[in-house]
Amino acid sequence: MKSVQFCFLFCCWRAICCRSCELTNITITVEKEECSFCISINTTWCAGYCYTRDLVYKDPARPNIQKACTFKELVYETVKVPGCAHHADSLYTYPVATECHCGKCDRDSTDCTVRGLGPSYCSFSDIRE
């Protein structure tokens, strides 16, 4: 019986601790209007689960803030998009997360929606690696 309890507690601990908010590698699609195609770039972003709850009774004095896995620290890197016209600005700057935490989603810098375009969206038909 104790081994069953231990296994249950171990599985719960693993589900909570090992799926926390952490840095992960992703591929994003970058596009420049002047270049008429997209390229894929590997970068680092935050992903994982954060403890959150939704109150049954809404209290106007206590705002309900859902925590999301988001960046705590960012740096920016710049890549040159190959094949652009000579008159076009071929440099593209993108964010790279260096530290993550569970916190309020900043709508000024992050797509906080459930149904965003996603990192692989390209408005052009030509995607280059």
Curated annotation (Swiss-Prot):
Q: Which Pfam families match?
A: Cys_knot
Origin species: Ovis aries
Q: List the disulfide bonds.
A: 21-69, 35-84, 38-122, 46-100, 50-102, 105-112
Q: Which residues cross the membrane?
A: none
- Cellular component annotations (GO), alphabetically ordered: cytoplasm; extracellular space; follicle-stimulating hormone complex
- Name it: Follitropin subunit beta
Q: Does the keyword Secreted feature in the UniProt annotation? A: yes
Sites carrying a glycan are 25, 42
Keywords from the UniProt entry: Disulfide bond, Glycoprotein, Hormone, Secreted, Signal
Can you tell which superkingdom this protein's organism belongs to? Eukaryota
Please give the function described in this protein's UniProt entry.
Together with the alpha chain CGA constitutes follitropin, the follicle-stimulating hormone, and provides its biological specificity to the hormone heterodimer. Binds FSHR, a G protein-coupled receptor, on target cells to activate downstream signaling pathways. Follitropin is involved in follicle development and spermatogenesis in reproductive organs.
- Gene Ontology terms, MF aspect: follicle-stimulating hormone activity
Whichever gene encodes this chain, its name is FSHB
Describe its assembly.
Heterodimer. The active follitropin is a heterodimer composed of an alpha chain/CGA shared with other hormones and a unique beta chain/FSHB shown here.
Q: Which InterPro entries match?
A: Cystine-knot_cytokine, Glyco_hormone_CN, Gonadotropin_bsu, Gonadotropin_bsu_CS
An example of a Gene Ontology BP annotation on this entry? positive regulation of gene expression
